[in-house]
Curated annotation (Swiss-Prot):
This is Dynamin-like GTPase MGM1, mitochondrial. It comes from Saccharomyces cerevisiae (strain ATCC 204508 / S288c) (Baker's yeast). Changing G409D: In mgm1-5 mutant; temperature-sensitive mutant; impaired fusion of the mitochondrial inner membrane. Residues 243-245 are annotated as: G2 motif. GO terms for biological process: cristae formation; heme transport; membrane bending; membrane tubulation; mitochondrial fusion; mitochondrial genome maintenance; mitochondrial inner membrane fusion; mitochondrial membrane organization. GTP binds at S220, S221, G222, K223, S224, S225, G239, K386, D388, T415. Residues 668-780 are annotated as: Paddle region. Disruption phenotype: Deletion of MGM1 causes the mitochondria to fragment and aggregate, and subsequently to lose their mitochondrial DNA and become respiration deficient. Residues 217-224 are annotated as: G1 motif.
Amino acid sequence: MNASPVRLLILRRQLATHPAILYSSPYIKSPLVHLHSRMSNVHRSAHANALSFVITRRSISHFPKIISKIIRLPIYVGGGMAAAGSYIAYKMEEASSFTKDKLDRIKDLGESMKEKFNKMFSGDKSQDGGHGNDGTVPTATLIAATSLDDDESKRQGDPKDDDDEDDDDEDDENDSVDTTQDEMLNLTKQMIEIRTILNKVDSSSAHLTLPSIVVIGSQSSGKSSVLESIVGREFLPKGSNMVTRRPIELTLVNTPNSNNVTADFPSMRLYNIKDFKEVKRMLMELNMAVPTSEAVSEEPIQLTIKSSRVPDLSLVDLPGYIQVEAADQPIELKTKIRDLCEKYLTAPNIILAISAADVDLANSSALKASKAADPKGLRTIGVITKLDLVDPEKARSILNNKKYPLSMGYVGVITKTPSSINRKHLGLFGEAPSSSLSGIFSKGQHGQSSGEENTNGLKQIVSHQFEKAYFKENKKYFTNCQVSTKKLREKLIKILEISMSNALEPTSTLIQQELDDTSYLFKVEFNDRHLTPKSYLLNNIDVLKLGIKEFQEKFHRNELKSILRAELDQKVLDVLATRYWKDDNLQDLSSSKLESDTDMLYWHKKLELASSGLTKMGIGRLSTMLTTNAILKELDNILESTQLKNHELIKDLVSNTAINVLNSKYYSTADQVENCIKPFKYEIDLEERDWSLARQHSINLIKEELRQCNSRYQAIKNAVGSKKLANVMGYLENESNLQKETLGMSKLLLERGSEAIFLDKRCKVLSFRLKMLKNKCHSTIEKDRCPEVFLSAVSDKLTSTAVLFLNVELLSDFFYNFPIELDRRLTLLGDEQVEMFAKEDPKISRHIELQKRKELLELALEKIDSILVFKKSYKGVSKNL
């Protein structure tokens, strides 16, 4: 029974020394097969031993031991199998991790070969013998030939070919991650930052800048494809018509610690765009925004692409040269494009002249323009595209030509496959391999890849493989030539770094001069006073809060009571005018004694209705609304007295904040006030003191009303004339004349006459009631005869009660919460909004811009000085070119 654990232990030791690799030969068994056979032997041996043990020992005294061992037998077997299973899983995981890289390479090669075979087979149907009319070597043939050579080398054990394959694999790995960090002193990234700073200072200056690589070429030269091959993404708009109508200032930033590929549009304040279809769409819209009548614009589009797979470069893509204007294009388009390109081709910019191999260099628009801007060819790099369209010997002669010599030479690239990639060719059986593509291209993209992104990535890989296979196949022709996109990238990195490095000292001198001028202006105009948009905003908010604090001290209970009392006085006058002053029996109130109890009851009920209408008119909401409006109006007055009056953004924010704070307590305050005045709706108890105050207030109120009526009547009389007004009034008072002609009187004159009659009657009534109030109405007993006094007393009680709760529920809450809420909303404002607010004032805008210019110049000068200090310890940089 002890044989099974011992054999398992021996087996584990043997398996531990067994190599876990995948054998390609069918005659060699894998470790899994050996392990399975050994496990079978273990089980058979253990079973045989157990049976033998039971048969040979039949003693009754040993039955308990036998039974216990039989029971433990499954446990031993199960434990052994579990240990073996765990070991198998461990070895399988080790084997999978060992072969993962190899499988990935095989998968990439298989997919590319399937694509090439599909293209070759489809080409056999449409072309003669599978060869294109352009004379290119079919990609599938190149890949197949390369694969056959590799297999033959492996069978023969040729060490030289193995070394070549290792070099190619190493090149592929180096291409996957850009090595900008290892190039020279890695100064390009810092100098591109300086260039970006200088562009912020003055983007239109041709002197205050560092060199860039300016890409020029005709529309069919493959200019856009060269840029996309450097970036590794398709993002530039293409089309049969001219789609590049504005310069594209492209900045590539190497981010070694990031797996994302993102795009920024700094001038549009759009950042971290991961969808390059969106980038392409935006570039198309920005270019198409240029009117057809203008065709091209000098306003650049600023685009920054960040990735671990791009070098640190600063490029400018210009509109392609044309030979003949189209019918829908302006006649001066050719001249406009030439003038725009000349602006960017000036020193110290590097010129990247793109020319197609199938076009004679004598007709190259790019070389012609570069020769005009750089006669000696010291700043020009020639790039020859579409080398696969010509014979290798001719391609070599183009790259090594002496007719059009350039100091930096020519670089040959192939940026496209012989035929465009069709989606149906992405899979072996006509279907897009979505799963495999996702595994390849979604790495580092956090799930952002889609079918279109996969297609773009596949195009770049296939293009790179095609270029690599072509130059490898024709290696003997391009021995002494500079070819491949990788070589172009390396050359651009070195040249740009050297050019920028050489331009640092003269640029530093210019920056110092500009800084001195800016500092002098800043001192003269603003006395070196530091001001930021945020500090300007906070200073104005502090002034606003101080004004609100003063308003809080002035706006106490008496102010609130006067506002509410004035409104209720007007309501009292409206009630009196409606229910009393139009009553024909008003004269009866002046008699010493009413004729009957019925008449007395009539005036008593009339007073109750008037009082009820006053108390049930919605005092809660009326008083709350009046208080709210008074606060908002005073807040507007405070804003108008500060510098915020010129800033609509902050004025709206302050007003909306105040409205929200007041609205939060509006309904609860109105309900509280309404509940407090509820007893006055049923019974109003007046003391003699209240009556006396109300009587005096009523007299003053009637006097003011009488004064206003007399003033208005006198104004009409002066405007029309006393005699003419008397005639009109006499005519209107005679009712029989209303049915006849107007005797030449205008409609306006008749309206003035009607108003004068009304005012005359109202003055007589007010004079009559004023005498009544002065001579009588001395006590509450006469409240039915003196409704003016009674209603005035009621309004006074309503006002006093409402003010108590308005002061507590609304005012105190507003003055406490408004500054807090205002600060909270101000913190939510972004830097862009704060800067926009500050620049609404022209003087402040000038202050901030001049100060920002001074700070940017200081920052650029500091960075340049640090690079120059470091550069002194580095000699012979230009010798690496």
